């Protein structure tokens, strides 16, 4: 028994000596035990969607991490990214938009709540230039959100300078892989959110399984802490006029909370994510709003027949909408506290088991 105790003490001394040498070589904080308080609650930036914030588990996109938003054309990728920028700006954050597609609609961004006067915008000529700009912005430590729109438009310099028919195998994938190796650590230290918008392509010759894939190789899939698959489900009509789209978002990867959660919300033209639409949907799910047939009511007050009429009522009665929203957030917050409490209890049980056995 004493021999094993002496052996453990010697091992501990050797470990302490190694840690001391690492700190001398690389600085204090280069290595530490988790119980020393290095891990804290992950800060987040809201996505502008109550349902999506809940599905992500921490109230939005995690700071200090890389996020990928991908989906088909006109599915709401840029809209979601602009909402994140708007939410960050509301809290005094500095944001940048790397418009590699040269297609940013300033008027639309303004309608979504983005302060375009303070938004930093770059329209780079090459993929290398775009990623260098991202690196400089991240290293400044003064940026909260950077959006790159899109990965598919990050064209390598060799491809731009070459002829139209030249073949450049894997150039973009190598470029992105090299850039992400450099960006991952500095994004974490700068505590900013780096959002890559990506497009979908089809694999040739796939008979079984999903033929869809994203551009830029596999590096972004590995380096992303959160990956969102956003799809347009159906059109929202006012009589015969299409006024928006019902949108589905699936969290296909999440390193900070349980993944594979799925949410639905409405994206309205010239408005973005419909907040009142989400309030109605979440209110019905949480039994705050009563739904009988096609009629919606709250506290015995009829909101309207059909979802669009109920949305119109809440837009006209902001106090009622705010009251319902606060109840929704209160219930969701209490659910998160319960899950955190259960996680702490499980951790304590594991510690007791290790001590006993």
Swiss-Prot record:
Annotated positions binding ATP = 71-78
Q: Can you tell which superkingdom this protein's organism belongs to?
A: Bacteria
Q: Does the keyword Metal-binding apply?
A: no
Give the intrachain disulfide bonds.
none
The record, for NCBIfam families, names:
tigrfam_recA
Q: Which family does it belong to?
A: Belongs to the RecA family.
Quote the protein name from its UniProt record: Protein RecA
Q: Which organism is it from?
A: Ehrlichia chaffeensis (strain ATCC CRL-10679 / Arkansas)
